[in-house]
């Protein structure tokens, strides 16, 4: 970023509206005010003024707000012009401002980027601005606001501070090996390390929940042919998204539906029936089904209730359960309750949710919808929750791996130097979340996804 650049952009959505806002940030914002308004407004007071063209004619009239730096959103001098929301009027005013030397159109996210570079926001807070704008549910909006107000950053900074204290302790043990107390073997470092690992695990769990709120949960419907998978997809989607017949193997490819349940985003995926393939096309479809299962956030294990009375998934199809990724959540869905006469509703079997329904009639499907909402955290108390992005999850995961490797070095060989290095790497991973340690490349990718005027 050049210190000589003063940027301008429309801060309101394109198109017609009651109000249109142009935002200017940089050292020439003062010159813009004096040129277009004829005066410098009183700081942080709304001033109703005409917006003038170069020949003195009035282009529009509206509210001008002046925020001298560093007490502004970006940390620079900021001017906001709030006029009428017609695109022609805003375009004329924008062209007028751009005639002033040293002014240019802002890049996407450049206002937030400058706020980050001037220490007005950390990187997680800056990302939360875009997440708040893009939020698709009330819970996602509340969580994004929590992140913007620093909830996520505070948790990360607490971990970084704990790692800093632990590193100091470890470095002391390395630098002063002749002390009477062996810091590496007296158990104190191990206890502190375990505390940090436990805190990090808690943050990771909340971050995974926040990622589901932001990006949506990937739910794969899997099971044997003719279990009713496509009928369930149609019931959840509220339309005929998949062809349904009595012929086994009708679905041969992956079908995707993006739906919202009370504003919560879900990616529902219908897959080919799992069995020994009878032809090449079906075999490819089954391979793709397993690929989707391996990447799922949750699997709906669809069971034809007319073929078995079993409810434990390990009893219904042990080979299928054995092949699933470890820790992948499973919901057992016993279908065709309209035929079997089973009592509709939800229960639990060996730690797995069990839902009895009829995909054909729609009976019991609402119970499944509520279950999916709850599994995303919709019904839980998340007043202090925050949104998280995939890069946040990756950074937390890498930090956790370094801490586990450091613990192994400590317990296996009392190798203080190796432990100190793993702690340093974990601290670096966490600092990438808030932007204390990051690359220009990463900043460019993050802020380029923002709105122009943000």
From Swiss-Prot:
GTP binds at residues 226-231, 245-251, 270-273, 335-338, 358-360. K(+) binds at residues 226, 245, 247, 250. It is found in: Cytoplasm. It is an enzyme of class 3 (hydrolase). Pfam families: MMR_HSR1 (PF01926), MnmE_helical (PF12631), TrmE_N (PF10396). Binds 1 potassium ion per subunit. SUPFAM superfamilies: P-loop containing nucleoside triphosphate hydrolases (SSF52540), TrmE connector domain (SSF116878). One of its GO terms (biological process) is tRNA methylation. CDD domains: trmE, TrmE_N. GO terms for cellular component: cytosol. Residues 216-377 form the TrmE-type G domain. Its EC number is 3.6.-.-. Its main location: cytoplasm. (6S)-5-formyl-5,6,7,8-tetrahydrofolate binds at residues 23, 80, 120, 454. Its cofactor is K(+). The keyword Amino-acid biosynthesis does not apply. Keywords: Cytoplasm, GTP-binding, Hydrolase, Magnesium, Metal-binding, Nucleotide-binding, Potassium, tRNA processing. PROSITE patterns: G_TRME. GO terms for molecular function: GTP binding; GTPase activity; metal ion binding. Disulfide bonds: none annotated. PANTHER family: TRNA MODIFICATION GTPASE GTPBP3, TRNA MODIFICATION GTPASE GTPBP3, MITOCHONDRIAL. Belongs to the TRAFAC class TrmE-Era-EngA-EngB-Septin-like GTPase superfamily. TrmE GTPase family. Homodimer. Heterotetramer of two MnmE and two MnmG subunits. Exhibits a very high intrinsic GTPase hydrolysis rate. Involved in the addition of a carboxymethylaminomethyl (cmnm) group at the wobble position (U34) of certain tRNAs, forming tRNA-cmnm(5)s(2)U34. HAMAP family: GTPase_MnmE. This is tRNA modification GTPase MnmE.
